[in-house]
Design a protein with these regions (language model features):
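Non-Sec secretion/translocation targeting segments of pathogen effectors
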Residues: 1-3, 271-273, 281-309
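Conserved structural core of kinase catalytic domains
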Residues: 65-105
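Catalytic-loop of the protein kinase fold
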Residues: 117-133
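C-lobe/activation-segment region of protein kinase-like
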Residues: 134, 139-230, 235, 260
Length: 309
C-alpha cells in the first residue's frame, strides 16, 4: 500500500469488519492482518484538526502508532488506518513482565521518544489506556496518537523533556512506585533511604530539565528488595508479593518527596519552586534559587577542569 494513499470503503463493508474497541470519539475496526481502521464519530470529527493530522501522516516512529492512511467511507473522510498492536494494555501486563525485558523495552522507548522530538511531536492526552505491550516484539507502543501535536516553536530538547515527563508519569503509576501511592510496594520503597534518595534526585532532575529515567528506579528497587529479602525478584509481581508479607512501619523522620500531579507537570519556575518547597519543608526565596543555580554552575565548571586534567 502506497504511503498516504486514501483508502475508500463503503459502510456495508465496514459493518462486516471486526470491532476491536469503542471510545468517546471513535470505533476501531480490524483491517487486514496488520492494520486497524479508526473511524471517527461526530464528536471525533469536531475535534479533528486537519492541519495537524496532515503533519502526523508524514512521520514514522517505532513507539508511536501514528496515523498512516486516510480513510473515506461512502466518499467522505471518516478516519484513518494505523498499525495493529497485538497485545494488551501495559498496565494489565506489567506485573508479569521479566524486569530485564521491561528495562530493555523502556530504554528502546526512550530512544524512540528522543527520535520523535526531532519532528517536534508533542504528546497530547497521553493516558494509561493508550500505552500497550506488543507481545510479538516485547516493546512498548503508544496508540491513540491522532491528537498529538507538531509544534515547531519549541526546541527539540524542550519537546523531548515534555514527552518524557508525560511518559515517565504513566510508567510510575503502572509500576506502582510513585510517592504517595497506596500501601504496598511504593510505600515500602519510599521508607528505604536508598530508594527514597534516588527518587528525590530523579524528581529534582526532571524539574531542572535533566534527562531522568524510570529504569534507574527499577534497578534500585530490585536491589533494595534483594538486599532486604535475599531474593532477586524476576518481575514486579514478585516484588509486591514479598513486600506484602511484611508489616510496613513509616518512620517519623523519613523525608518522602511529594509527587507532582500530572496536571501540574510543567517545568515552570513557579511550579518547580513549589515542589522543592514541598520536598524540603522549607520556603524557598529567590536568593535560594539563585544560590542553587550558582552551585550547579560551579559544579559544572569543576567537572570541566577535572576532565581537562
Amino acid at each position: 500500500m502506497a504511503e498516504n494513499e486514501i483508502i475508500k470503503i463503503n459502510s456495508e463493508k465496514l459493518n462486516r469488519m471486526q470491532v476491536l474497541g469503542r471510545g468517546a470519539c471513535s470505533v476501531v475496526y480490524k483491517y487486514g492482518d496488520n492494520q486497524v481502521i479508526k473511524v471517527l464519530n461526530e464528536s471525533g470529527m469536531k475535534l479533528h484538526n486537519e492541519e495537524q493530522f496532515e503533519q502526523l501522516l508524514r512521520i514514522n516512529n517505532d513507539i508511536c502508532v501514528l496515523p498512516q492512511n486516510k480513510v473515506e467511507i461512502d466518499g467522505k473522510f471518516q478516519g484513518y488506518t494505523m498499525e495493529f498492536v497485538d497485545g494488551q494494555q501495559l498496565q494489565e501486563k506489567i506485573g508479569k513482565i521479566d524486569l530485564d525485558t521491561l528495562i530493555s523495552a523502556i530504554k528502546k522507548a526512550e530512544q524512540d521518544i528522543r527520535n520523535l522530538a526531532q519532528d517536534k511531536v508533542f504528546f497530547q492526552d497521553l493516558n494509561q489506556g493508550g500505552i500497550m505491550w506488543d507481545e510479538k516484539s516485547d516493546r512498548i507502543k503508544i496508540i491513540d496518537t491522532d491528537f498529538f501535536e507538531v509544534n515547531q516553536d519549541f526546541e527539540e530538547e524542550e519537546c523531548f523533556n515534555a514527552n518524557m515527563t508525560s511518559f515517565n508519569t504513566m510508567l510510575e503509576m503502572e509500576l506502582g512506585i510513585m510517592s504517595g501511592q497506596a500501601k504496598g510496594l511504593a510505600e515500602y520503597l519510599h521508607t528505604n533511604p536508598q530508594f527514597s534518595n534516588a527518587y528525590r534526585e530523579y524528581i529534582l532532575g526532571s524539574l531542572m530539565g535533566k534527562e531522568s529515567s524510570v529504569v534507574d528506579l527499577i534497578q534500585i528497587a530490585r536491589e533494595v528488595i534483594e538486599n532486604e529479602f535475599g531474593v532477586i525478584p524476576q518481575n514486579l509481581a514478585e516484588m509486591r508479593e514479598l513486600v506484602g508479607e511484611q508489616e510496613i512501619e513509616i518512620s517519623d523522620v523519613t523525608d518522602t518527596p511529594t509527587f507532582l500531579p500530572p496536571d501540574q507537570q510543567v517545568g515552570t519556575p513557579i511550579l518547580g519552586k513549589q515542589v522543592l518547597e514541598e520536598m524540603s519543608d522549607t520556603q524557598l526565596t529567590d536568593e535560594t534559587e539563585n544560590e542553587m543555580a550558582s552551585q550547579e554552575l560551579e559544579l559544572q565548571q569543576q567537572s570541566s577542569v577535572e576532565q581537562e586534567r
